[in-house]
């Protein structure tokens, strides 16, 4: 089952591609141009974000203003852009979606979601202020203590998994890096 729209034409020369094993020993069928030989790859997309938190344990969530899952709560996150590191992308998304000032921390969770062709990376990020300026993708940015988190109103399973891990680590007093596969 393909997760992406199939590539139909070569981006270099415009010739219709054929799907086959490339001649370089690759083990996956790829879109190969029969005219110029270009091999076209379709790989998972990286989603990068933060867990913005205050020392008292409250976390910042954003109420989505866009689809998918408009009107649901999420951590600030989005697709990584070309030319930026994962942590730069996470900081950018936090600024764009929440207008939050943060001090970036280490990677906290890496979640593989193969059914949608994505890898999600969340970083710990201490909030430097309780002032937020949500962007156009966010209806509201609000701080939540663990018992206040709207668990049934979270937009994505990756967000729920990450928050559960973060609160568990905080309770233990030690943060790790978590790798999760989501079927």
Task: Enumerate the predicted regions with their spans.
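A short beta-loop-beta micro-motif enriched in histidine and acidic residues
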Residues: 68-69, 137
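Residues that recognize and position ribonucleotide moieties
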Residues: 73, 100, 142
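Short, basic/glycine-rich phosphate-binding loops at helix/coil junctions
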Residues: 69-70, 145
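N-terminal leader/linker segments that precede catalytic domains of diphosphate-processing enzymes
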Residues: 1-68, 79-96, 100-131, 172-183
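Short glycine-enriched loop/turn motifs at secondary-structure junctions
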Residues: 74, 115, 134-137
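Conserved acetyl-CoA binding element of GNAT-fold acetyltransferases
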Residues: 72-78
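Nudix hydrolase/Nudix homology domain
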Residues: 1-6, 135-183
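Short glycine-/acidic-enriched loop or helix-start segments at secondary-structure transitions
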Residues: 22, 71, 153
């Amino acid at each position: 089952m393909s997760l992406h729209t199939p590539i139909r034409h070569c981006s270099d020369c415009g010739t219709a591609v054929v799907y086959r094993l490339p001649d370089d020993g690759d083990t996956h069928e790829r879109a190969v141009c029969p005219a110029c030989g270009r091999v076209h790859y379709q790989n998972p997309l990286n989603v990068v974000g933060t867990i913005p938190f205050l020392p008292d344990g409250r976390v910042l969530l954003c109420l989505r203003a866009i689809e998918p899952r408009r009107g649901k709560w999420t951590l600030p996150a989005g697709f990584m852009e070309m030319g930026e590191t994962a942590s730069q992308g996470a900081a950018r998304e936090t600024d764009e979606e929440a207008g939050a000032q943060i001090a970036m921390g280490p990677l906290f969770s890496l979640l593989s979601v193969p059914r949608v062709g994505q890898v999600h990376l969340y970083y710990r990020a201490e909030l430097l202020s309780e002032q937020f300026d949500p962007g156009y993708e966010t209806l509201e940015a609000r701080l939540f203590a663990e018992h206040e988190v709207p668990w049934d109103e979270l937009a994505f399973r990756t967000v729920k998994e990450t928050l559960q891990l973060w609160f568990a680590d905080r309770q233990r007093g030690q943060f790790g890096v978590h790798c999760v596969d989501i079927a």
